[in-house]
């Protein structure tokens, strides 16, 4: 499903459709896309404190905007899949992770 959505988003980039929100984002450019990713990320954090339906909705919005960002930067979805696979099963010690300092 994500692959299909990503392909549709890429298609909008090369074959604009009048009135499409995806086209609007591409027309406005990277800064607008990044702004939306930031907004949606914040909304996910807030929704996580509320009910699951709201959280699901916000994660869906964030996922869509991340796919638009990938398409804007011409990063294949396959690259993300490969990166996730490369991390699968790898153990990480908290002492090796500088960003984790309050466990």
Swiss-Prot record:
The keyword Secreted does not apply. Residues 84-103 are annotated as: Disordered. GO terms for biological process: L-histidine biosynthetic process. Its EC number is 3.6.1.31. GO terms for molecular function: ATP binding; phosphoribosyl-ATP diphosphatase activity. InterPro entries: HisE, PRib-ATP_PPHydrolase-like. GO terms for cellular component: cytoplasm. It is found in: Cytoplasm. Keywords: Amino-acid biosynthesis, ATP-binding, Cytoplasm, Histidine biosynthesis, Hydrolase, Nucleotide-binding. The keyword Hydrolase applies. Pathway: Amino-acid biosynthesis; L-histidine biosynthesis; L-histidine from 5-phospho-alpha-D-ribose 1-diphosphate: step 2/9. It comes from the Bacteria. Its main location: cytoplasm. Belongs to the PRA-PH family. HAMAP family: HisE. This is Phosphoribosyl-ATP pyrophosphatase. It comes from Listeria innocua serovar 6a (strain ATCC BAA-680 / CLIP 11262).
């Amino acid at each position: 499903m994500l692959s299909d959505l990503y392909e549709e988003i890429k298609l909008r980039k090369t074959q604009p459709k009048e009135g499409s929100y995806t086209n609007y984002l591409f027309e406005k450019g990277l800064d607008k896309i990044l702004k939306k990713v930031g907004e949606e990320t914040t909304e996910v954090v807030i929704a996580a404190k509320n009910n699951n339906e709201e959280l699901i909705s916000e994660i869906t919005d964030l996922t869509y905007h991340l796919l638009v960002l990938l398409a804007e930067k011409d990063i294949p979805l396959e690259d993300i899949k490969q990166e996730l696979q490369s991390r699968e099963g790898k153990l990480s010690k908290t002492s090796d992770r500088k960003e984790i300092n309050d466990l």
